[in-house]
């Protein structure tokens, strides 16, 4: 029973998402027993009526006390509410079935806010304009937009429950060096170069191209003029691709047999694979007691013949181009459910990602994303940038300058002479004069002249309040220019994009290159790394997740427990039980890291659960540990999609090591409890070293 709502301070609904159970509870609450023929209010109106007291009380407390509540539960703990104010929009997440904790709900809100930024760019900084974008006056457009974000939230919830990479928020590579190299060459020659040398590209510049097999990254290539893509942005792109072309095997256990058939909120069920209330050692359920008594199959402990000293869990094919057939036989069940066919391509989309423009960092630069499906589960993604991208840098710098000026004005009254002497103001004035002269828009010209008259007048300088109002007006007009140039002219609205025949050419060439590999890739994506490769050296190890937080990449054995695809643990309750343990460990590790703990080791039933976070230099030498910051319960959630916690943690650690490159790593492990703890810790160190060496395999 779940709900997400975005509303204004006046309780106007800007977006909502509910599951069927929550809608049913609303129907019962607003049902008219006296006149059954009377039509019920629209779902949007029901939500507004239900949550108006919460919204108004929260905003009133913020206005009167400069503080408000961020989380509360209803009587008897039936419903849990989490609230967060982003700008002028209040985000509310509700759970009524005890399957989501406060941290889960807060993470969902931050992810939704991040998805808004990816889709609307810097328009999100202006409350008035983002309200217009989220609630267009045309009803059909509004329904289409809301259904898009409802579908994204449903996809995110599904992937977080079923895919390890979304559970820990990191990129998972499909490990096969020779195939990766082949794909990189193909991306360079047949995608990036083919597009950039085409006379019909219309000024669009191909920057990045990558191949996905389900949610795993096979290969990635960037042009020489492109800046690096943040791991958080790349993970968000994988989410968008999975929303467009969901993997059948990850959606097969959902309540709706075909979740893509209808994308409205009425058809977006969300199930949780684990309960946050049963993660402690004493919180075992009856199901846990039963599965604790299972003995692991004997063949699980019998390592297969080692494929070679270089192997780190994946078999490397040295010669011949195509994999041997015995590799395909090991997962024939996977192939039966993933019969390749060619989905219909989606249209190009305008998205906003952080990048460098003219050697300067710029947040939320407009890109165009082309998702070209090769076969079911295998997708080619191309990112291009239009010639107008430098305008985004100029607008971003100007809006940032006015935001800093607003901050200074709010700190205290500034006399005119003192304001003029600020280096920030002089630089901002020079940049704005140049921009206004080049743009020539009458409205922003008059507003800028009005601002200069108040800010730089020696005889009659404006007050701080007047300058603040003028700053806000200028920022809104700059934001409107940004919206006009990058949202109104988006490819989906008829804006410029690559011609269709060029997209078809790229798609066809990549299909030809990978035709012999498609079946192998679909199998490999489900059994990327096998535990058998590690059991000889690490007896008692059941599962692990290793994450390089500097690059945002993870390594973990496959963990599938659906009815049609499975890992080495099989398809029964044992696989589901181990998966539940791993997901609970991920959540518990985050909670302890939030409180400043970087090491966690505890016994739960027949298992030892452990978590380690540490820092190294580029040579792989472990660095001295520090006390990591302790965060409040309502802080930005730990991960990449909600706020990139690890990038901030690396900056925090690097303050005392300005001349040394610092890297951050995490290891989560599940062992049998018969293993002594000192041996477990020793194994963790050896496992981390082995995985560090394996992760040196280049992806780019």
UniProtKB/Swiss-Prot annotation:
Intervals holding [DE]-X(4)-L-L repeats: 45-51, 147-153, 516-522, 644-650
Residue positions of motif Melanosome targeting signal: 698-700
GO molecular function terms attached to this record: guanyl-nucleotide exchange factor activity; protein dimerization activity
Biased composition (Low complexity): 275-286
GO biological process: intracellular transport; lysosome organization; melanosome assembly; platelet dense granule organization; vesicle-mediated transport; visual perception
Protein function: Component of the BLOC-3 complex, a complex that acts as a guanine exchange factor (GEF) for RAB32 and RAB38, promotes the exchange of GDP to GTP, converting them from an inactive GDP-bound form into an active GTP-bound form. The BLOC-3 complex plays an important role in the control of melanin production and melanosome biogenesis and promotes the membrane localization of RAB32 and RAB38.
Protein name: BLOC-3 complex member HPS1
Lineage: Eukaryota, Metazoa, Chordata, Craniata, Vertebrata
Gene name tied to this protein: HPS1
């Amino acid at each position: 029973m779940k709900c997400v709502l975005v509303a204004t301070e006046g309780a106007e609904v800007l977006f909502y998402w509910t599951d069927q159970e929550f809608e049913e509870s609303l129907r019962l609450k607003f049902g008219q027993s006296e006149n059954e023929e009377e039509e019920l209010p629209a779902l949007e109106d029901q939500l507004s009526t239900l949550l108006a007291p919460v919204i108004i009380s929260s905003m009133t407390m913020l206005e009167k006390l400069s503080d408000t509540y961020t989380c509360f539960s209803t009587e008897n703990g039936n419903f849990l509410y989490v609230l967060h104010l982003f700008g002028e929009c209040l985000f509310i997440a509700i759970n009524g079935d005890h399957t989501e904790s406060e941290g889960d709900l807060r993470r969902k809100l931050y992810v939704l806010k991040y998805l808004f930024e990816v889709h609307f760019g810097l328009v999100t900084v202006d409350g008035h304009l983002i309200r217009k974008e989220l609630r267009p006056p045309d009803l059909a457009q509004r329904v289409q937009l809301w259904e898009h974000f409802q579908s994204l939230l449903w996809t995110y919830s599904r992937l977080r429950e079923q895919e390890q990479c979304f559970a820990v928020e990191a990129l998972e590579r499909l490990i096969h060096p020779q195939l990766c190299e082949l794909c990189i060459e193909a991306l360079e020659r047949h995608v990036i170069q083919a597009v950039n040398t085409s006379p019909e590209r219309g000024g669009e510049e191909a920057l990045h191209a990558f191949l996905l097999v389900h949610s795993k990254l096979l290969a990635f290539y960037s042009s020489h003029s492109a800046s690096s893509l943040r791991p958080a942005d790349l993970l968000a792109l994988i989410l968008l691709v999975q929303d467009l072309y969901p993997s059948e095997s990850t959606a097969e256990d959902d309540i709706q047999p075909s979740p893509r058939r209808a994308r409205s909120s009425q058809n977006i069920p969300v199930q949780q694979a684990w309960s946050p209330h049963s993660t402690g050692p004493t919180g075992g359920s009856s199901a846990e007691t039963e599965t604790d008594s299972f003995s692991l199959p004997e063949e699980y402990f019998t390592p297969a013949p080692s494929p070679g000293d270089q192997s780190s869990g994946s078999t490397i094919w040295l010669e011949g181009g195509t994999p041997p057939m015995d590799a395909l036989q090991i997962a024939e069940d996977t192939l039966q459910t993933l019969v390749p066919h060619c989905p219909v391509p989606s249209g190009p989309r305008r998205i906003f990602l952080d990048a460098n423009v003219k050697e300067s960092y710029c947040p939320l630069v407009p890109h165009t994303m082309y998702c070209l499906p090769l076969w079911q589960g295998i997708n080619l993604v191309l990112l291009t940038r239009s010639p107008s991208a430098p305008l985004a840098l100029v607008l971003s710098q100007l809006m940032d300058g006015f935001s800093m000026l607003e901050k200074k004005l709010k700190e205290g009254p500034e006399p005119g002479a003192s304001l003029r002497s600020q280096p920030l103001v002089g630089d901002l004035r020079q940049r704005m004069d140049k921009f206004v002269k080049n743009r020539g828009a009458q409205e922003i010209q008059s507003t800028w002249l009005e601002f200069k008259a108040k800010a730089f007048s020696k005889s009659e300088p404006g007050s701080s309040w007047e300058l603040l109002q003028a700053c806000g007006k200028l920022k809104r007009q700059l934001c409107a220019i940004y919206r006009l140039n990058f949202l109104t002219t988006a490819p989906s609205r008829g804006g410029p994009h690559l011609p269709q025949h060029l997209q078809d050419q790229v798609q066809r060439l990549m299909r030809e290159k990978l035709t012999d590999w498609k079946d192998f890739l679909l199998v490999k994506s489900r059994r990327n790394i096998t535990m058998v490769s590690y059991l000889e050296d690490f007896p008692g190890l059941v599962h692990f997740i290793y994450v390089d937080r500097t690059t945002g990449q993870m390594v973990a054995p496959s963990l599938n427990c659906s009815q049609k695809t499975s890992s080495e643990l099989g398809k029964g309750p044992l696989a589901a039980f181990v998966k539940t343990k791993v997901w609970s460990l991920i959540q518990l590790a985050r909670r302890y890291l939030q409180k400043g703990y970087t090491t966690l080791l505890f016994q739960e039933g027949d298992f030892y659960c452990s978590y380690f976070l540490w820092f190294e230099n580029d040579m792989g030498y472990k660095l001295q540990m520090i006390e990591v910051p302790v965060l409040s319960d309502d802080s930005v959630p730990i991960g990449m999609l909600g706020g990139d916690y690890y990038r901030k943690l690396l900056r925090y650690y690097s303050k005392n090591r300005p001349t040394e490159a610092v890297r951050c790593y995490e290891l989560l492990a599940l062992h049998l409890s018969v293993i002594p703890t000192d041996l477990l810790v020793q194994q963790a160190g050896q496992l981390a070293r082995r995985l560090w060496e394996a992760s040196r395999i280049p992806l780019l």
